[in-house]
Amino acid sequence: MGFWMAMLLMLLLCLWVSCGIASVSYDHKAIIVNGQRKILISGSIHYPRSTPEMWPDLIQKAKEGGVDVIQTYVFWNGHEPEEGKYYFEERYDLVKFIKVVQEAGLYVHLRIGPYACAEWNFGGFPVWLKYVPGISFRTNNEPFKAAMQKFTTKIVDMMKAEKLYETQGGPIILSQIENEYGPMEWELGEPGKVYSEWAAKMAVDLGTGVPWIMCKQDDVPDPIINTCNGFYCDYFTPNKANKPKMWTEAWTAWFTEFGGPVPYRPAEDMAFAVARFIQTGGSFINYYMYHGGTNFGRTSGGPFIATSYDYDAPLDEFGSLRQPKWGHLKDLHRAIKLCEPALVSVDPTVTSLGNYQEARVFKSESGACAAFLANYNQHSFAKVAFGNMHYNLPPWSISILPDCKNTVYNTARVGAQSAQMKMTPVSRGFSWESFNEDAASHEDDTFTVVGLLEQINITRDVSDYLWYMTDIEIDPTEGFLNSGNWPWLTVFSAGHALHVFVNGQLAGTVYGSLENPKLTFSNGINLRAGVNKISLLSIAVGLPNVGPHFETWNAGVLGPVSLNGLNEGTRDLTWQKWFYKVGLKGEALSLHSLSGSPSVEWVEGSLVAQKQPLSWYKTTFNAPDGNEPLALDMNTMGKGQVWINGQSLGRHWPAYKSSGSCSVCNYTGWFDEKKCLTNCGEGSQRWYHVPRSWLYPTGNLLVVFEEWGGDPYGITLVKREIGSVCADIYEWQPQLLNWQRLVSGKFDRPLRPKAHLKCAPGQKISSIKFASFGTPEGVCGNFQQGSCHAPRSYDAFKKNCVGKESCSVQVTPENFGGDPCRNVLKKLSVEAICS
């Protein structure tokens, strides 16, 4: 009897756990999961921007970094490339991705949208949607709403069928409908508001059992939670008092565009922004991005968004830790979680500590107390009095006190190591074969129309390329044939790039930019008496991903097209007979694939084309040993696309040099996307990620299509590895270890901080490049001695670190031969070479 009673009680307990407790709700303090308010740290990882083989490692590293939730968009055009034909495999296996997150013990925030933006091609919309009769995007339009509801319902039903919502025992605790709709609604007016209310009701009626959010939109209807996106969101307040303060996109930097420099965001400012949000009552923060990844294939939007979507995220494009950002934020998350009991219990009280300083204190009835001491001054340290103690606050920083007494973390004091990454060649170059693609002609698979057609309407985005071809008849009596003053061809295009061929010869190239994709070709061209063939190769570089009325956007040669300098004056070519051909011959033959590559006759050796436009190159190589991330150095090439074993690494365009000013960037002060830049005057993207899972042990096919003309012999396969590691630690820097000792009762006096150095597995510290205890200056990779320097700064590191994978050295004067300058705030800067 006792056995069966125990079994019955166990069954009832299981039912209670699965049915009674599994719930997600919210109040004004936080998201409530299974009855418990939670401070949630989230990170964006977009499943198609990495490979399934990378997912477990990325998610594990996010978890180790203190992340509780993985956030992702759902990419409609990846899942329904043709109307009614769905795809959920390989990089688009959404269910598998969510289950990998679940296996790691993390939650999921599923941003169904289905508009994504995300610098993704066409904002995530499938191009076929543009051609649904009567459609108008993201407004009170029946054809659009019907398509949106159908896809959203399909995704929700898939999640339910796999039991992936938290209320079913799964990891999904939040969903999002629409995306950043506030600016759109403001522009559209009443139709936008009606659509927004419809979208909210449609989503709630799907019955997911978890809350829905709408981001960057102040007037979302109940019960939807409105949330904030931006570089800072401490100012944000939800539109109802019963909703939690949530930050769905804390931008870790910004995207890279072809022709632009590479943005980055200092770890200190990122931590400051997050701490500032938490101290003002925020309880959910998502890093956009935590791992940015790669825009493989033709998935980048913009137009002109680069193939790399690195975003200066805590995990870099290749999946490696970006230090110190990953480590500094990990320490921040640990400090915040120590404060969680107080943070979720009460609203803060605010006390001024000076003109630019304040304290925000969370003190619960149960006795939990946490304090955030902030110094908003961008230029000066502050010494503040709080709770009968004094605290030193660096400029533009926040100190976190989980017991309202002891500082465990300051946003401007980085305890994590920095790492300098390097790209090491793993091959001496490749043995190439080439195939030259001629300018298209009327004899090719073409169709004819009088006048100029919009590009995407013709290509339906199956290719970046559309040929516009026409004939120009030149009378033998034309004056320019004798004078040598060539006639002037002018072509107006909606974008994004254009190659002009005259009688099969390249006459010029023009291209736009993200800010101004439209372009004009205007140049003299060499014509002969008789019939001349004009071939315009119009190129799309990703479809726009943001803005109103997607159905109206266009690309390609829309005209006018004219020829000046003839006896007749100007000849309008716009309404001539034009021949059209979608794509390239090499695309039609699938030259990039293992099966299609043998379909043409390639040349090799001295006959390989170099610096020739419209050239295809191929080679084979064996996979290198090891497990370091791999990339192709494409710096000697112009523009085109790259494939490995038939899989596209993305568009390459290293010849588009970046503009902008890359001046020294300080972490203090307001950050925006133009503040901190690198790569000025260089190619926007040199390195192109090669996923190891795409490689065979031997015989890998590498194919490059080059539009402009480059030198393929400069292409090299490289591995990405740590070149050196650094520590930059102040004396008496706050550290969590002292707090842990205090809580354990083993605290007698605070311990000095330590410099921790760690190379990658398989590497060892081979030498110490720099070490100085005193007042060193500079940053990792470029340290210099200051006016104060302990002469034995190197000794402890040579003794304790050289020959080891990792080491720790306490930052205390005794380790460096004594105090080199008393009554001066000192720090230790060290750089160790990994090999």
UniProtKB/Swiss-Prot annotation:
<comment type="function">
    <text>Involved in cell wall degradation. Degrades polysaccharides containing beta-(1--&gt;4)-linked galactans, acting as an exo-(1--&gt;4)-beta-D-galactanase.</text>
</comment>
<feature type="active site" description="Proton donor">
    <location>
        <position position="180"/>
    </location>
</feature>
<dbReference type="InterPro" id="IPR048913">
    <property type="entry name" value="BetaGal_gal-bd"/>
</dbReference>
<dbReference type="GO" id="GO:0019388">
    <property type="term" value="P:galactose catabolic process"/>
</dbReference>
<dbReference type="GO" id="GO:0009505">
    <property type="term" value="C:plant-type cell wall"/>
</dbReference>
<dbReference type="Pfam" id="PF01301">
    <property type="entry name" value="Glyco_hydro_35"/>
</dbReference>
<dbReference type="InterPro" id="IPR000922">
    <property type="entry name" value="Lectin_gal-bd_dom"/>
</dbReference>
<dbReference type="InterPro" id="IPR001944">
    <property type="entry name" value="Glycoside_Hdrlase_35"/>
</dbReference>
<keyword id="KW-0326">Glycosidase</keyword>
<dbReference type="InterPro" id="IPR019801">
    <property type="entry name" value="Glyco_hydro_35_CS"/>
</dbReference>
<dbReference type="InterPro" id="IPR017853">
    <property type="entry name" value="Glycoside_hydrolase_SF"/>
</dbReference>
<feature type="domain" description="SUEL-type lectin">
    <location>
        <begin position="749"/>
        <end position="835"/>
    </location>
</feature>
<dbReference type="InterPro" id="IPR043159">
    <property type="entry name" value="Lectin_gal-bd_sf"/>
</dbReference>
<protein>
    <recommendedName>
        <fullName>Beta-galactosidase</fullName>
        <ecNumber>3.2.1.23</ecNumber>
    </recommendedName>
</protein>
<dbReference type="InterPro" id="IPR008979">
    <property type="entry name" value="Galactose-bd-like_sf"/>
</dbReference>
<feature type="signal peptide">
    <location>
        <begin position="1"/>
        <end position="22"/>
    </location>
</feature>
<feature type="active site" description="Nucleophile">
    <location>
        <position position="249"/>
    </location>
</feature>
<dbReference type="GO" id="GO:0030246">
    <property type="term" value="F:carbohydrate binding"/>
</dbReference>
<keyword id="KW-0732">Signal</keyword>
<dbReference type="InterPro" id="IPR041392">
    <property type="entry name" value="GHD"/>
</dbReference>
<dbReference type="InterPro" id="IPR031330">
    <property type="entry name" value="Gly_Hdrlase_35_cat"/>
</dbReference>
<dbReference type="GO" id="GO:0005773">
    <property type="term" value="C:vacuole"/>
</dbReference>
<dbReference type="GO" id="GO:0009827">
    <property type="term" value="P:plant-type cell wall modification"/>
</dbReference>
<dbReference type="Pfam" id="PF21467">
    <property type="entry name" value="BetaGal_gal-bd"/>
</dbReference>
<dbReference type="GO" id="GO:0004565">
    <property type="term" value="F:beta-galactosidase activity"/>
</dbReference>
<dbReference type="Pfam" id="PF02140">
    <property type="entry name" value="SUEL_Lectin"/>
</dbReference>
<dbReference type="Pfam" id="PF17834">
    <property type="entry name" value="GHD"/>
</dbReference>
<keyword id="KW-0378">Hydrolase</keyword>
<comment type="similarity">
    <text>Belongs to the glycosyl hydrolase 35 family.</text>
</comment>
